[in-house]
């Protein structure tokens, strides 16, 4: 009989499997109580259903409040919006997927290898586990939620909210966000992990972790060569590591680290652990509650603090120095050594034999636990103490401290306080003991002791003990022939006196225990008065709290009190009278003894072989011997037992919970009541009459007799058919007689039907079981929840009904006409057989090796055939499932609607018929032969599976992929899949073929509701036909043949379709999105309608009249569209869609709905240097949209739109702009022709840039042309008949070139204008020998340029320099040098922003005399970095960069007059000159220009008026200035595209008005500021400002 079962999850098959150990021996079960494991039931509950094709679960709830507790998702299965409550579980196996799952408290989700879970929410108490190879995406972990990811598992896009738990290691792959930001684990490296509330990260050998945060309840494990740096260990966070790892971070004590075998400042708490390896060390460690430090041999720890519930272990060869043990802290020294340990109150130091602890400081309340084999030294409150060489001195034992003095060893001056303990073994010696209250001494009279206790002096010497105090765990053992006097036994103390020993003058206080027998001699007092034992007579003994008295035969005891924990044992022939048996007191005796006394039931006695009213509890025992009797016995708890021996009898016995009555052969029991937890055993030859079995009670009868039984509900009977039984149960009368059992009720009980015997009409309820042995039989058995039936080899059962929770195990036996209802299970073991079984919904049958099932009907239930098992003539109806596992087989199976057969790895099936709605599913290494698929049936063959000699009738579906092996016939002939190639497959009515990477499919037909799925790298060959609503799917499909859509009513493809093949559509409607490229092109005929939606297409299209092609929602088609000999099809371009022409094209009706037709070269032709115009011929045009066109106005060629018929609508011509110059700007270029209609065309931006000039669109009749002049004629010439020629406009590029040609003049002059003020600083500091100065300048100038150009110049810059002043008697001369830089932004009036960076430097000299005359001269050189930026009319950006050099200077003369004491006036004359070099300019739009030498010459006359003020000791000089300047340069030349000359005339007069102030802050430092306004013929500067400083030497 298989008695021990284990269930093991098999990762490869994705299911639970059952393993067993054979325990049956000799063909018959041993006759003893059994609690058989319900292995089949467990297997059935844990065994998930095998995957069916594409099972989709939506809005399911599992667990509490739901109808189902579990869900298994296998290959192809999906589950969406699942809620998993308490007790619910979801397992996602390989190929299965779960989306939008919510896991609540007590719910579980398991994602196995190959399974996936997306968008999971884990609430408090919920659990998600991702196994190796499994994946989870977008998991949200709320507070208390738990995510576990095994090594090799993947979880990405995690949201870990506060309190959410992650448990993983560095072999896993994770990413997501937590309250600290983004975190990840990849390639063995973990970053920014948050561990809290049970979170766990294991950093494996050679891996690493950075920026880990460990909050309370979090756990970080780092061992070996692993490393973890930048750790934040908050309070309650745990680290487990060893000193071979590398760690660094901060804890509440500051920075900590482990490096090079050295650990510093570690905090160990809440399961944290540090292993200090050999040769390594740890310093400044703090061990809090739950923390552990282990110091191996050769390792060391220094400055360790051990707090409450912290532990330090020092092993052999290890050492610990300067350890502090606080209250609740523990240090264990086992063969190692500890030095300088301080034990504070409540601290605990344990030193094992062979361990060493020296320089101990034992403070008051500190505990030391050791023995005299250890070595110790230190100080306590009594001074120095030590243990060495087996001798202990001055030890203090308290608060859990303990000293064991071994035989031959000694202890002197020992103090034992409350909670301390001293044990002295026989032959050991302890003298000068001080035993204070609560201190415990344990010894026997072979030891030698002396000392004082609260009673005075005590001693043990030469086998004599005197004045001993026993309490709080203390004990004294008086050996035979030894004696003890004046012993006091308090609560918790114990005195044991052997036979022949003597103890007198005993004081036994409440709770004190005496253990002895009537051969000893005792005297003393207890709470009942005087007691004694002498000459085999005991009087007034008190037995409690472990006390024991044995009264031997012929001896006696009187007035014995037995309290809880006390035992009185009276041997046969012994006498004990006047017993008081209180609750919990134990009597152990037999009916040969003589007893009398009282218990809680009243008076009891045993006399003359008759026992009456005995109470057996707390392990008490009564033997009823032959010829004797027991009446009115009560048997209570703790296996209290009555044995009724042969010839004995028991009457009116009550057996309560934990009580036992055994009736041996020849014994008898009458009128027994068995209550819950009570047990009565009737052995062979024994008898029981009138037994009542109440709920929870148990009667066991093997070969014995029990009659007149009353079996109440919940009462258990265990028997075999060799027994004789009769009685009544809830079903009526029952009996066992002559090997026949009838109407038995088994609940928690068992019935063993032996060979040749039988059982009929048996009911088996929860906990009940029936075993049918070899040649035994059972008929009409009903098995309910928790009931079990076992049928051994050659045993047989017939007409069995198995309800929910019931289980039948055929151990080589047979079962006929069994019905398995919901939740019922049958296991058919080797050599077993089941015939005519009906498996209803929820029922389950499993066939093991060498077992078989025949003529089975499965109505919604399941049958599983394991290795070596077989099933024949099986019919599966709706909801029925048959699983053929490795080595299992099935023959002649019929699958009706809703029935499913699953062939797993190594399973084989022959002669299956699949009717409509039925399904056969073949998994890897599964094999089927001679399967017939009728209309509506489905055959699914997974990768690695095989199916041969298949007959696929019309309407039959095949679901498979190119890694399977198939062969058979269909309507087209022979089909096959082998070696990754599929040929002549027919897919309809749910059929699916998946073409895997590197595989191909030839001549496939996809009919109604069929699907052809092509993975990236899969190839289609031959003719692939999609008819009716057949579907093609795939992210990337390669077509090397002809992809033929034949009258497909609604074909939709989303993905990438490429290859050298062709796409043909005959009739029907198709929609394509993604990417499409077919070298053989696309052909539309017979009214075909193709819509491209968000598609990138690259193919030439041939259309037939009556067909239509639509581009929608941003689609892009690159290729020619042409008609055939019947004409051309219609074309529509909608929304943001674009049609790129790669050549001349012809369409029927062209409709633009905000779409674009692009004549410009595509990416594939853009590298072609020579421009080739393209023409588009359309029969008609309507709608609105854009035509992007190319022109080469320079060669007078361009693209052409030719509408032969009617054109209506509004269209924009987006014609590419250029900077190149046409040959002739006056010749029109035709771009559009229409046959008729009112279509309106306009240019994008209203014009086209071509070189220097802008071109405009002009209409002539139904043709449209590009011309260089505007569409409006010029104005009339007064007095003539000739109008003024139309106006031409320069392009923005030309304007920008003209702007940039003049910019250096204004930049230079502005810098020079600011520079002139520096001479005033020199003149103000007449006594200074020189100095340094600096100033910042800023301006905003609006400038008019040549040919209508203009711009704004914004300048900001700085200048700095220094000079030396020479004294020339009546005058002075300042000579200096300077450098400058300015950043100049140019905003062109017609668009664009250019920049000029100006870097310069120069020399200056200023002469001035005492009469106020001055002359100032400057020479300056500049380098200009010019960056031109503008746009053409079509919005195309234009740029050109170049550098330019320039130089110039100024000369100024004037005189300062004093009008009065504080007022002065300064008239002056100034001239400036500048010249910038000629420069060739090239723009990236093809425009070229030559800026000639740019010149400037200015004259200026002006006056400054100011005052000198003394403000708080500081000289402040406010002033006003006005001047008139004239520019003389009017002929700066610019030539564009070597075709057109332009003149930049910058001449004109400018007025200047300003105000400023300077201040001499100290004798050596001054500052100034000025603002001015300038306005002239070509310029206006609303504001120009400067600020500066000077520091004198």
UniProtKB/Swiss-Prot annotation:
Membrane topology category: Multi-pass membrane protein
Inactivation phenotype: Severely reduces bacterial colonization of the gastrointestinal tract of orally infected C57BL/6 mice.
Region described as Disordered: spans on this chain: 65-100, 1267-1286
Main subcellular location of this protein, as a coarse class: membrane
Skewed-composition ranges (Polar residues): 65-85, 1269-1280
UniProt cross-references to Gene3D superfamilies, sorted A to Z: 2.160.20.20, Autotransporter beta-domain
Keyword annotations: Cell outer membrane, Glycoprotein, Membrane, Plasmid, Signal, Transmembrane, Transmembrane beta strand, Virulence
Domain Autotransporter: from-to ranges: 1325-1593
The organism's place on the tree of life at top rank: Bacteria
GO cellular component, one term: cell outer membrane
Disulphide bond pairs: none
SMART domains listed in its UniProt record: Autotransporter
KW Glycoprotein (keyword) present: yes
PTM per Swiss-Prot/TrEMBL: Glycosylated by heptosyltransferas BAHTCr. Glycosylation is required for adhesion to mammalian cells and colonization of the mouse host gastrointestinal tract.
Pfam families: AIDA, Autotransporter, ESPR, Pertactin
Biased amino acid composition, Low complexity: 86-97
Signal peptide: 1-54
PANTHER family given in the database record: AUTOTRANSPORTER (PTHR35037:SF7), C-TERMINAL REGION OF AIDA-LIKE PROTEIN (PTHR35037)
Protein function: Autotransporter required for the colonization of the mouse host gastrointestinal tract, possibly by mediating bacteria adhesion to host cells.
Domains: entry comment: The signal peptide, cleaved at the inner membrane, guides the autotransporter protein to the periplasmic space. Insertion of the C-terminal translocator domain (beta domain) in the outer membrane forms a hydrophilic pore for translocation of the passenger domain to the bacterial cell surface.
Protein known as: Autotransporter CRAC
Species for this entry: Citrobacter rodentium (strain ICC168)
Organism lineage: Bacteria, Pseudomonadati, Pseudomonadota, Gammaproteobacteria, Enterobacterales
Gene this chain is encoded by: CRAC
């Amino acid at each position: 009989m298989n008695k021990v079962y284990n269930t093991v999850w098999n990762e490869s098959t994705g299911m639970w499997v059952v393993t067993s150990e054979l325990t049956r021996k000799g063909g018959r079960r041993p006759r003893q109580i059994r609690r058989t494991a319900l292995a089949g039931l467990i297997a059935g509950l844990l065994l998930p259903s095998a995957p069916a094709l594409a099972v989709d679960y939506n809005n399911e709830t599992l667990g509490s409040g739901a109808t189902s507790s579990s869900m298994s998702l296998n290959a192809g299965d999906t589950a969406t919006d699942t809620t998993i409550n308490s007790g619910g579980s979801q397992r996602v196996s390989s190929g299965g997927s779960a989306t939008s799952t919510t896991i609540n408290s007590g719910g579980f989700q398991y994602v196995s290898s190959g399974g996936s879970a997306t968008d999971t929410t884990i609430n408090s108490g919920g659990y998600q586990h991702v196994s190796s190879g499994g994946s989870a995406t977008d998991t949200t972990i709320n507070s208390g939620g738990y995510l576990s990811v095994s090594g090799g598992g993947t979880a990405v896009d995690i949201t870990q909210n506060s309190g959410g738990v992650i448990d993983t290691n560095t072999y896993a792959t994770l990413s997501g966000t937590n309250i600290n930001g983004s975190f990840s684990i990849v390639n063995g490296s973990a970053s920014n992990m948050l561990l809290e509330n049970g979170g766990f990260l294991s950093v494996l050998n050679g891996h690493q972790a950075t920026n880990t945060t460990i909050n309370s309840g979090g756990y970080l494990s780092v061992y070996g060569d692993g490393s973890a740096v930048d750790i934040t260990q908050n309070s309650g966070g745990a680290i487990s590591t060893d000193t071979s790892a590398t760690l660094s971070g901060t804890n509440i004590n500051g920075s900590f680290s482990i490096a090079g075998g050295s650990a510093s400042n570690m905090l160990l708490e809440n399961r944290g652990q540090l292993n200090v390896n050999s040769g390594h060390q740890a310093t400044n460690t703090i061990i809090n509650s739950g923390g552990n430090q282990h110091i191996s041999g050769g390792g060391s720890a220094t400055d360790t603090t051990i707090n409450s519930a912290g532990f330090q272990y020092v092993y052999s060869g290890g050492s610990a120095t300067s350890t502090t043990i606080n209250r609740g802290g523990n240090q264990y020294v086992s063969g190692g050594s500890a030095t300088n340990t301080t034990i504070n109150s409540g601290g605990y130091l344990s030193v094992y034999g062979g361990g060493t602890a020296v320089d101990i400081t034992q403070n008051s309340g500190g505990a030391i636990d050791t023995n005299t084999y250890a070595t110790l030294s230190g100080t306590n409150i009594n001074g120095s103490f030590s243990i060495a060489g087996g001798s202990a001195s001055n030890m203090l034992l308290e608060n859990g401290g303990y000293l064991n003095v071994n035989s031959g060893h000694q202890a002197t001056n020992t103090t034992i306080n409350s909670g301390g303990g001293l044990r002295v073994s026989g032959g050991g010696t302890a003298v000068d003991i001080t035993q204070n209250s609560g201190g415990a001494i344990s010894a026997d009279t072979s030891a030698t002791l002396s000392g004082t206790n609260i009673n005075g002096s005590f001693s043990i010497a030469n086998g004599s003990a005197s004045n001993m105090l026993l309490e709080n765990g203390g004990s004294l053992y008086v050996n035979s022939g030894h004696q003890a006097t004046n012993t006091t036994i308090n609560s918790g103390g114990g005195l044991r006196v052997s036979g022949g020993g003597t103890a007198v003058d005993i004081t036994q206080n409440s709770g004190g225990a005496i253990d002895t027998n009537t051969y000893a001699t005792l005297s003393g007092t207890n709470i009942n008065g005087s007691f004694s034992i002498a000459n085999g007579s005991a009087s007034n003994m008190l037995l409690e709290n472990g006390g024991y008295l044995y009264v031997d035969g012929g001896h006696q005891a009187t007035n014995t009190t037995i309290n809880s924990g006390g035992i009185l044992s009276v041997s046969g022939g012994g006498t004990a009278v006047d017993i008081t048996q209180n609750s919990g007191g134990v009597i152990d005796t037999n009916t040969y003894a003589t007893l009398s006394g009282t218990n809680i039931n009243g008076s009891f006695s045993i006399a003359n072989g008759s026992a009456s009213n005995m109470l057996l509890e707390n392990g008490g025992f009564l033997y009823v011997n032959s010829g004797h009797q027991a009446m009115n016995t009560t048997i209570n708890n703790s296996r209290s037992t009555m044995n009724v021996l042969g010839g004995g009898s028991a009457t009116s016995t009550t057996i309560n919970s934990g009580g036992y009555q055994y009736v041996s052969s020849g014994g008898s029991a009458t009128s027994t009541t068995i209550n819950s937890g009570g047990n009565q055993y009737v052995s062979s030859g024994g008898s029981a009459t009138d037994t009542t079995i109440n709920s929870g009670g148990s009667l066991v009868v093997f070969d014995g007799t029990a009659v007149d039984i009353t079996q109440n509900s919940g009462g258990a009977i265990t028997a075999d058919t060799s027994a004789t039984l009769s009685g009544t149960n809830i079903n009526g009368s029952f009996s066992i007689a002559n090997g026949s059992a009838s109407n038995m009720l088994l609940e928690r009980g068992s019935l063993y039907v032996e060979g040749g015997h039988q059982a009929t009409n048996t009911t088996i309820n929860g906990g009940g079981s029936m075993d049918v042995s070899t040649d035994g039989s059972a008929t009409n058995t009903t098995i309910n929840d928790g009931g079990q039936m076992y049928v051994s080899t050659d045993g047989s059962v017939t007409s069995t009904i198995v309800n929910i929770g019931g289980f039948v195990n055929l151990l080589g036996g047979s079962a006929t006409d069994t019905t398995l209802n919901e939740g019922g299970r049958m296991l058919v073991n080797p050599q077993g057989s089941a015939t005519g079984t009906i498996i209803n919904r929820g029922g389950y049958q499993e066939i093991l090796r060498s077992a078989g099932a025949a003529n089975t009907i499965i109505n919604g239930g399941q049958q599983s055939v394991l290795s070596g098992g077989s099933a024949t003539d099986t019919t599966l109806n709706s909801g029925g499932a048959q699983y053929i596992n490795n080595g299992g087989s099935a023959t002649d199976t019929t699958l009706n609607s809703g029935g499913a057969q699953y062939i797993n790895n190594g399973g084989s099936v022959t002669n299956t018929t699949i009717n409509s709605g039925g399904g056969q599913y073949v998994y890897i290494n599964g094999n089927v032969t001679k399967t017939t698929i009728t209309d509506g049936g489905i055959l699914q063959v997974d990768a690695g599976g095989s199916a041969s000699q298949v007959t696929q009738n019309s309407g039959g579906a095949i679901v498979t992929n190119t890694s399977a092996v198939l062969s058979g016939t269909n309507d087209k002939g022979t089909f096959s899949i082998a070696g990754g190639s599929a040929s002549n497959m027919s897919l309809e009515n749910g059929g699916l073929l998946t073409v895997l990477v590197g595989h191909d499919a030839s001549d496939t037909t996809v009919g109604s509701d069929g699907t052809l799925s092509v993975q990236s790298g899969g190839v289609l060959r031959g003719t692939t036909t999609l008819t009716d609503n057949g579907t093609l799917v795939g992210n990337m499909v390669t077509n090397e043949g002809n992809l033929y859509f034949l009258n497909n009513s609604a074909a939709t493809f989303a993905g990438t379709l490429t290859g050298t093949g062709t796409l043909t559509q005959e009739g029907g409607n198709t929609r394509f999105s993604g990417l499409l490229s077919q070298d053989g092109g696309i052909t539309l005929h017979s009214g075909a309608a193709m819509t491209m939606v968000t598609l990138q297409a690259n193919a030439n299209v041939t259309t037939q009249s009556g067909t239509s092609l639509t581009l929608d929602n941003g689609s892009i088609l690159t290729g020619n569209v042409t008609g055939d000999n019947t004409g051309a099809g219609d074309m529509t371009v909608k929304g943001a869609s674009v049609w790129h022409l790669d050549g001349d094209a012809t369409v029927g009706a062209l409709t633009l709905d905000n779409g674009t037709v692009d004549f410009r070269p595509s990416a594939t032709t853009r590298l072609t240097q020579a421009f080739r115009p393209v023409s588009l011929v359309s029969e008609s045009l309507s709608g609105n949209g854009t035509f992007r066109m190319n022109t080469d106005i320079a060669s007078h060629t361009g693209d052409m739109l030719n509408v032969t018929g009617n054109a209506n609508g509004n269209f924009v011509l987006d014609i590419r702009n250029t900077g190149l110059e046409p040959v002739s700007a006056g010749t029109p270029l035709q771009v559009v022709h229409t046959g008729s209609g009112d279509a309106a065309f306009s240019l994008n931006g209203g014009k086209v840039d071509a070189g220097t000039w802008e071109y405009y669109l002009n209409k002539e009749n139904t043709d449209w042309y590009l011309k260089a002049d505007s569409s409006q004629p010029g104005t009339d010439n007064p007095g003539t008949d000739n109008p003024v020629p139309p106006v031409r406009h320069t392009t923005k590029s030309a304007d920008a070139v003209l702007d940039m040609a003049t910019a250096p003049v204004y930049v230079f002059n502005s810098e020079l204008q600011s520079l002139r003020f520096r001479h005033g600083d020199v003149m103000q500091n007449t006594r200074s020998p020189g100095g340094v100065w600096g100033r910042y300048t800023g301006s905003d100038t609006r400038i008019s340029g040549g040919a209508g150009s203009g711009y704004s110049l914004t300048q900001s810059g700085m200048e700095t320099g220094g000079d030396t002043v020479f004294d020339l008697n009546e005058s002075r001369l300042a000579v200096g040098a300077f450098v400058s830089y300015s950043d100049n932004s140019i905003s062109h009036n017609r668009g664009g922003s250019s920049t000029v960076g100006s870097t310069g430097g120069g020399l200056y000299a200023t002469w001035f005399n005492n009469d106020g005359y001055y002359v100032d001269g400057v020479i300056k050189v500049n380098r200009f970095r010019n960056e031109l930026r503008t746009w053409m009319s079509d919005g195309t950006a234009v740029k050109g960069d170049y550098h330019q050099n320039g130089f110039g200077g100024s000369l100024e003369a004037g005189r300062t007059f004093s009008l009065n004491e504080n007022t002065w006036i300064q008239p002056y004359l100034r001239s400036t000159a500048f010249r910038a070099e000629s420069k060739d300019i090239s723009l990236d739009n093809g425009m070229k220009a030559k800026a000639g030498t740019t010149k400037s010459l200015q004259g200026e006359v002006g006056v400054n008026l100011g005052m000198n003020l003394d403000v708080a000791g500081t000289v402040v000089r406010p002033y006003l200035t006005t001047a008139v300047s004239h520019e003389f340069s009017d002929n700066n030349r610019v030539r564009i595209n070597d075709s057109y000359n332009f003149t930049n005339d910058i001449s004109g007069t400018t007025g200047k008005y300003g105000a400023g102030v300077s201040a001499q802050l100290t004798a050596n430092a001054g500052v100034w500021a000025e603002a001015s306004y300038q306005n002239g013929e070509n310029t206006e500067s609303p504001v120009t400002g400067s600020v500066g400083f000077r520091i004198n030497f």
